[in-house]
Amino acid sequence: MTIYRTGALRVVSQSILEYTSAFVLVIALYVLSCLGIAAAFAFLVWGVSAGQRLRTDIIGVHAITQIAKYLPTNTLHLVGRHAVLRRRGLSDAALLGAGLSEIVLLLLAAGGLAALGASDELATHLDLDQRFPAIMGAVLAALALIAAAALRVDRTVLVSPFLTWRAAAGASVAISVYCMFFTLSGVILWVLLAQAIQVPVPPDIVRLTSYAAISWSIGFVSPGAAAGIGVRETILILLLAGAVESAPATSAAVAYRLVTTLGDLITWALAGIWWWARR
């Protein structure tokens, strides 16, 4: 109802026609970030697979199966990915370890960036000499969470494969990519607000990155929400409402969903072409 009441669909439709280049840019950024997520998973599998080379076919499988997140339960992409890669010779242990690491590190990257965004917002209400300690405190808290999660994973999932330099290297690459993924999401939101929706003074990219991370996380853990549809938009509108008016906040959330859906379809198509070319 909010979408229709605020005229968000009409605004987004007009924006696509008037600012096509902006939409092309943000969709390209999203596709790039999706491929980065797929590459990160390949590094995680490499990290927990002793003697295994870095396999590029994992990137293609990840990109193809990811489209299944739009089906009910929001878990079929994980199941499908595991099944396909298992048939391609990877062990259950490696796939389960990499899959768990992916979930933990994604949520930690999101939590860390959300904390940074919160500290940035808090800093606006603090004196200059208090801002740096507030931001550094958030950074240290995020690093502590990452370290704690790494230890937790090491102790609970097939201990030995995770206690290697390969696992550390794979996890380091992955969490760096995940941080970049959420940062690009913040950039996408900024471009949509500033260029497509034409908000005079949009929130800064640090804050938008934290909003994207928070909405993604809640959508991810919400049971049954296919690709977080509905949940992420609701959270994003609530977060943006504190910085912009309700109508542009709703329009931005709708535009962001459109960008991510089209981006997922394009990623799936590109991966499908790659897969066909390899046959």
Regions found by a protein language model. Give the residues of each.
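Membrane-interface alpha-helices at helix entry/exit sites of multi-pass transporters
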Residues: 55-60, 74-79, 86-103, 244-255
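A broadly conserved amphipathic alpha-helix scaffold signal in soluble, globular proteins
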Residues: 83-84, 97, 106-109, 113
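Re-entrant/interfacial helical elements at transmembrane boundaries that shape
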Residues: 75-88, 224-241
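Predominantly cytoplasmic-facing regulatory/coupling regions of multi-pass membrane proteins
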Residues: 1-63, 110-112, 116-222, 239, ...
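Transmembrane alpha-helix interface/packing and boundary motifs in multi-pass membrane proteins
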Residues: 64-71, 213-229, 233
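Mid-bilayer segments of alpha-helical transmembrane spans in multi-pass integral membrane proteins
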Residues: 66-75, 103-112
